Amino acid sequence: MTAKTIRHYLQFTDFSLEDYEYVLERTGILKRKFKNYETYHPLHDRTLAMIFEKSSTRTRLSFEAGIFQLGGHAVFMSTRDTQLGRGEPVEDSAQVISRMVDIIMIRTFEQEVIKRFADNSRVPVINGLTNEYHPCQVLADIFTYYEHRGPIAGKTVAWVGDANNMLYTWIEAAQILGFKLRLSTPPGYALDMKLVSPDSAPFYEVFEDPNEACKGADLVTTDVWTSMGFEAENEARMQAFADWCVDEEMMGHANPDALFMHCLPAHRGEEVTAGVIDGPQSVVWDEAENRLHVQKALMEFLLLGRLKH
């Protein structure tokens, strides 16, 4: 593989609408193969390096199982027990690791770190999560919506809660896929406009009242109030976010057939009530499973390009 052919997936804007249409189609195909116990090994003998600076359940399991199901295998690497955690330059680690594997997934804190790694990698790099963006999760959410309701283009998504990596990724997705995002965050926790492209302005609207943000929504989504790395702010956040709990009353402002999503782990009684996340509008378990399927399609696409079957 030459440098000219390498594609990375570091944030949602790395793919075009046409790329997403293809990847979502492939996701459905790969999920059907999985459900039918059909052996499919297009990535036979390929190796995925998984580098974790942030702990994970869903990210590790979905990538490790996914590459295995495609015929490859995974190597787990933690910064706690590699030279990355002992001060080796990111650029040097990227040069070495990318000469020994076929594709790399990184889950870390700063987006700048994964960008520097990708700039020095000889193989595709996937963002498994950073403080700024979480593209694999939003891609899974969009596929989940597609499964249950059809294309998301022209629909309305409501975000209630923190201005975190999920929200910034949803804003990018709205611009590329053509849906409307209505968002509400507490005072003092507004968007960091350095992470928002001016071109995305027509695709999102900010509301002070979370109930107002949910009006007419086809999908309501949220996340934890205190993300990893912000634990010191937890007490202050519990007070600031108290009115941003997605409950049955808030869901009542959305369309009657609106879905509810949460990327998990969830804290019932904080960002969402048990009645909502465990209720009939919730699709969080399908959403969690779909991380597996979209990431399989993503790895297949980055390594093999567009397939004709």
Swiss-Prot record:
Instruction: Output the PROSITE patterns linked to this UniProt entry.
Output: CARBAMOYLTRANSFERASE
Residues binding L-ornithine, per UniProt: 165, 223, 227-228
Swiss-Prot/TrEMBL GO biological process terms: arginine biosynthetic process via ornithine; citrulline biosynthetic process; L-arginine biosynthetic process
- What GO cellular-component annotations does this UniProt entry give? cytoplasm
- This protein is called Ornithine carbamoyltransferase
What is catalysed by this protein?
A: carbamoyl phosphate + L-ornithine = L-citrulline + phosphate + H(+)
Broadest EC class assigned to this enzyme? transferase
A Pfam family matched by this chain, by name?
A: OTCace_N
Which domain of life, per UniProt?
Bacteria
Query: EC no.?
Result: 2.1.3.3
Q: Where in the cell is it found?
A: Cytoplasm
UniProt xrefs under InterPro entries: Asp/Orn_carbamoyltranf_P-bd, Asp/Orn_carbamoylTrfase, Asp/Orn_carbamoylTrfase_sf, Asp_carbamoyltransf_Asp/Orn-bd, Orn/put_carbamltrans, OTCase_ArgI
Q: In which pathway does it act?
A: Amino-acid biosynthesis; L-arginine biosynthesis; L-arginine from L-ornithine and carbamoyl phosphate: step 1/3
Q: Main localization of the protein? A: cytoplasm
A GO molecular function held by the record? amino acid binding
Sorted alphabetically, the keyword list is:
Amino-acid biosynthesis, Arginine biosynthesis, Cytoplasm, Transferase
Q: Which SUPFAM superfamilies match?
A: Aspartate/ornithine carbamoyltransferase (SSF53671)
Record-listed carbamoyl phosphate binding positions: 56-59, 83, 107, 134-137, 263-264, 291
Name the species this protein comes from. Answer: Burkholderia lata (strain ATCC 17760 / DSM 23089 / LMG 22485 / NCIMB 9086 / R18194 / 383)
Keyword rRNA processing among record annotations: no
Which family, according to the similarity comment? Answer: Belongs to the aspartate/ornithine carbamoyltransferase superfamily. OTCase family.
